[in-house]
């Protein structure tokens, strides 16, 4: 049987999460996102007007629109400002190639890789070489970072249940 958390357990878990990872966990819980779906969110995937998120190539390669809790809007705006600071710094680096885009899109809109909207909402802390083309890019946060934090926080709270990202 799957692990189910009570509302008070979820509240305690989310509040005890490390601050820099809390929004990820809140989005997973509140919008029903899977681990890689939340990791791959881009700035342009957020629709503040309709309070929804766009998930591209989710499980089974499907696209879907999910609800966005209005309580998360201030935190999301802060996160976008955080991404913008990385973006501005990255664009000053002549070797920076932008984010990786789907092949057809990269051919059709070569400048899109350096537009803010295509950048990950939860970026890695450092630039790295793309294994496909060797270009200098900023990838998304490593998923194991969130997985370890969720498990560690659940252990710290002594919930007595095996809690993973999938539980959220």
Predicted segment positions?
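Conserved catalytic core of the tyrosine transesterase superfamily
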Residues: 1-168
């Amino acid at each position: 049987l799957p692990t189910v958390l009570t509302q008070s357990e979820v509240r305690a878990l989310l509040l005890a999460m490390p601050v820099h990872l809390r929004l990820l966990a809140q989005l997973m819980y509140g919008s029903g996102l899977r681990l890689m779906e939340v990791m791959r969110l881009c700035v342009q995937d957020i629709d503040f007007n309709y309070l929804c998120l766009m998930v591209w190539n989710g499980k089974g390669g499907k696209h879907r629109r999910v609800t966005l809790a209005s309580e998360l809007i201030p935190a999301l705006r802060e996160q976008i400002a955080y991404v913008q600071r990385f973006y501005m710094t990255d664009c000053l680096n002549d070797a920076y190639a932008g984010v990786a885009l789907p092949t057809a899109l990269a051919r059709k809109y070569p400048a899109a890789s350096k537009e803010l909207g295509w950048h990950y909402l939860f970026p890695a802390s450092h630039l790295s070489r793309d294994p496909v083309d060797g270009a200098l890019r900023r990838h998304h946060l490593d998923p194991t970072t969130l997985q370890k934090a969720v498990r560690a926080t659940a252990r710290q709270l002594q919930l007595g249940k095996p809690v993973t990202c999938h539980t959220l």
